[in-house]
């Protein structure tokens, strides 16, 4: 007997780009994918990559939160949020979905639920490495608490853009970036807290390990079955 659920499960394209992808190239790639999703010529997609050292400004970014505009290339991202750093050792996952349809626990046309579920995806991914990620009601992203000092540091950022209910941009999880590079901005406009990474917490995992954890935790939340991770 065939499993009817297996026959009707929706898949989503997952792929990863080797090397460092310049930020403008990523924007162009997402714009092309989003246009295809809208007209039915391209599938929904999760795109895994790293950027060269880059500062990006969300729609709420303030000039005074960028300390050295000439330190790294700086781009207006068009996504929600404030200043973000991207660089080697940080796993960026760009998620492109048609939100006019439900996706797992995310109802159709519910942006708040979508953002909440992106955070939950990161929290479940971190749990696979014995790291407790937490939400904060007044701060978007995922946070960890230093058991020794009680300090809260950000380990993952997220920012999304929605165009006619097709979403793009996504999440950035700090695996092993140079944390000093964050010093050129006030990350996400939050001065009271710092940033951390899996390596800084003592978990010497690879980007590949993180990719598999992201993929393993996807389906229960978003409903679709990830394809094997291919090369973009």
Curated annotation (Swiss-Prot):
Where along this sequence does the record place binding of substrate? Answer: 79-86, 157-159, 170-172
Any one GO MF term held by the record is: lipoyl(octanoyl) transferase activity
Where does the protein end up? Cytoplasm
One GO cellular component term of this record is: cytoplasm
Q: What is its main location?
A: cytoplasm
Q: Which domain of life is it from?
A: Bacteria
List of catalytic residues: 188
* Site residues (Lowers pKa of active site Cys), renumbered to this chain: 154
For this UniProt record, the keywords arranged alphabetically read as follows:
Acyltransferase, Cytoplasm, Transferase
Enzyme nomenclature, EC number:
2.3.1.181
What is the reaction catalyzed?
A: octanoyl-[ACP] + L-lysyl-[protein] = N(6)-octanoyl-L-lysyl-[protein] + holo-[ACP] + H(+)
> Where does the record place a coiled coil?
none
Among the GO biological process terms of this entry, one is: protein modification process
Q: Which family does it belong to?
A: Belongs to the LipB family.
What other facts are recorded? In the reaction, the free carboxyl group of octanoic acid is attached via an amide linkage to the epsilon-amino group of a specific lysine residue of lipoyl domains of lipoate-dependent enzymes.
Return the protein name. Answer: Octanoyltransferase
Record organism: Gluconacetobacter diazotrophicus (strain ATCC 49037 / DSM 5601 / CCUG 37298 / CIP 103539 / LMG 7603 / PAl5)
């Amino acid at each position: 007997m065939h499993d009817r659920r297996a026959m009707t499960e929706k898949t989503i394209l997952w792929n990863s780009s080797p090397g460092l992808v310049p930020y403008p190239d990523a924007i162009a790639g997402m714009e092309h994918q989003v246009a295809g999703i809208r007209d039915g010529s391209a599938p929904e997609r999760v795109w895994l990559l790293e950027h060269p050292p880059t500062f990006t400004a969300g729609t709420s970014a303030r000039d005074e939160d960028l300390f050295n505009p000439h330190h790294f290339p700086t781009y207006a991202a068009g996504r929600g949020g404030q200043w973000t750093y991207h660089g080697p050792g940080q796993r960026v996952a760009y998620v492109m979905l048609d939100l006019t349809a439900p996706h797992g626990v995310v109802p159709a046309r519910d942006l708040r639920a979508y953002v909440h579920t992106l955070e939950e995806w990161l929290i479940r991914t971190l749990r696979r490495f014995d790291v407790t990620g937490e939400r904060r009601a007044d701060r978007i992203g995922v946070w960890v608490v230093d058991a020794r000092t009680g300090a809260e540091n950000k380990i993952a950022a997220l920012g999304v853009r929605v165009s006619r209910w097709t979403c793009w941009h996504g999440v950035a999880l700090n695996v092993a970036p140079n944390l000093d590079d964050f010093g050129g901005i006030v990350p996400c406009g939050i001065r009271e807290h710092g940033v951390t990474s899996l390596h800084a917490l003592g978990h010497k995992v690879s980007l590949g390990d993180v990719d598999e954890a992201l993929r393993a935790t996807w389906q229960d939340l978003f409903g679709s079955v990830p394809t094997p991770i291919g090369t973009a």
